[in-house]
Amino acid sequence: MLITNKFVTRNCKRSRYSQSADIPLTIQGAGNRRISHSEIEKNVDVNVLRKVAPHLEESIKFRNAPKIPSDVLDMIGNRFSCVEWSDYGDRPLAIQEDMAQFLKRQLRSNYLRTFIFRSDLIDNGELNDLFIEFVKRPTFKSLIGRTGTYISSQVVIAAHQAWLSRRSFEVGTQEIRGFVTPESLSALTAQVEITWDRKPHPSVPSASEFVFGAERMADNHGVDAYCIAFAFFNKFVE
């Protein structure tokens, strides 16, 4: 259960940080020692966040592009399996530098399995390199670019090549979703067979396989692009 603008604890005693009902930060977890799920809104009370930051684990979402001081971001650890950063305005925004460094730190973490984002930061060369390393890990599960967010063809190709070389898997289904330019799609189709006008939908395959769908549509700026969905189904999971 999530309640907007409140701290919420589930299956545990009430946190001593849950007295205010006007703090745009939603939390689920086991008391104040370990908070397993957090959603941080744009106008978060930084002083309160500073108190709970060391206790955040497992899943963290930054909604509506919150601006958080670097010292608070430094207090948040790297023990997240899922990290999400998004801005729900009319168009994706570039991420502030301190937050960008935080997200890069998460991408380097061996705990991370799912990364979800909506931003123009995909054009950042260093982040693109981290995406490539991320999707090549056997623990990689999902890389999802929200509406209008571009993903480099190099990232998809790296994930595909890593998938082909594996003999065993730690994750049952792996997926990449986002937008690509027509030029990037050409690079992809040279190496991967795609299914036009149909996004792949996860199902239970008879064996390990992958599917790749592409659908032509305009991005947030009205530019001609392709929305892709690339999924690996791994039957033989360790």
What residue spans do the PLM features occupy?
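The conserved beta-strand core of Leucine-Rich Repeat
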Residues: 1-238
